[in-house]
């Protein structure tokens, strides 16, 4: 039956994909528990700065931030890739794509599906996954595509079965920033300014109203 191995598989998967879609307000990020815990500790005026750190199992694998391959994506994100009918509505409304940038939300989903297929064939051949030296990041989805996204959610709004390419883009960006400290220079400057001046602009808070005196 052609249905099960063609793009028309989405006819079967559209319902569960819609059922498991994210009901949170669009654009709301998922907070990382470990990071939230550290920030609360830093901002707690009653916290003891000299308190001993909690014991950590030396054999425990450190938590990975974000996603660099399909193994880091959740089941709904993987289901999204197979629910896509490649209609292109998402790319048609993407402001980054319209202005000539490299990003195509449709391609993000196709690349994710291609990587899943690649990993599946690897597992079928070897009985388990054997490192093939490839990742979803860089080998399929380029960094230029990720940083072209404005996170406007137009692609999510346009999809008839509520596929969310933005969630994959955000997770891969999170990996780049938090695991590799890799971000466009403009973003690094902005984050440094927020850290130093509590604002994205490169001047002191005391100088904010100087423009009004001129």
Across the structure, where does each feature detected by a protein language model lie?
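Membrane-embedded alpha-helical bundles of multi-pass integral membrane proteins
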Residues: 1-54, 67
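Hydrophobic/aromatic-lined pockets within catalytic cores
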Residues: 4, 20, 24, 95, ...
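P-loop NTPase catalytic cores that bind/hydrolyze ATP
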Residues: 5-13, 87-88, 149, 153
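Short helix-terminus and kink motifs of transmembrane alpha helices
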Residues: 6-14, 106, 166, 170
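A glycine-rich phosphate-binding loop feature that marks nucleotide/adenosyl-phosphate handling sites
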Residues: 15-20, 34-35, 108-112, 173, ...
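Membrane-proximal soluble helical/coiled-coil segments
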Residues: 46-119, 123-124
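Iron-sulfur-cluster electron-transfer modules
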Residues: 72-81, 107, 116-214
């Amino acid at each position: 039956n052609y249905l099960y191995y063609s793009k028309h598989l989405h006819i079967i998967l559209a319902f569960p994909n819609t059922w498991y879609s994210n009901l949170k307000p669009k654009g709301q990020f998922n907070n990382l528990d470990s990071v939230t815990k550290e920030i609360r500790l830093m901002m707690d005026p009653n916290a003891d700065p000299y308190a001993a750190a909690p014991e950590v199992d030396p054999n425990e694998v450190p938590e990975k931030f974000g996603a660099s391959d399909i193994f880091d994506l959740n089941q709904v994100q993987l289901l999204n890739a197979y629910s896509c009918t490649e209609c292109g509505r998402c790319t048609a409304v993407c402001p980054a794509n319209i202005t000539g940038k490299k990003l195509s939300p449709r391609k993000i989903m196709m690349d994710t599906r291609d990587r899943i297929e690649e990993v599946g064939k690897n597992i079928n051949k070897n009985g388990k996954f054997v490192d093939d030296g490839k990742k979803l990041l860089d080998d399929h989805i380029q960094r230029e595509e990720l940083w072209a996204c404005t996170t406007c959610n137009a692609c999510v709004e346009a999809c008839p079965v509520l596929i969310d390419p933005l969630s994959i883009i955000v997770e891969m960006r999170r990996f780049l920033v938090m695991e590799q400290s890799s971000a466009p220079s403009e973003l690094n400057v902005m984050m440094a300014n927020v850290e130093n001046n509590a604002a994205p602009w490169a001047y002191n808070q005391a100088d904010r109203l100087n423009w009004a005196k001129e």
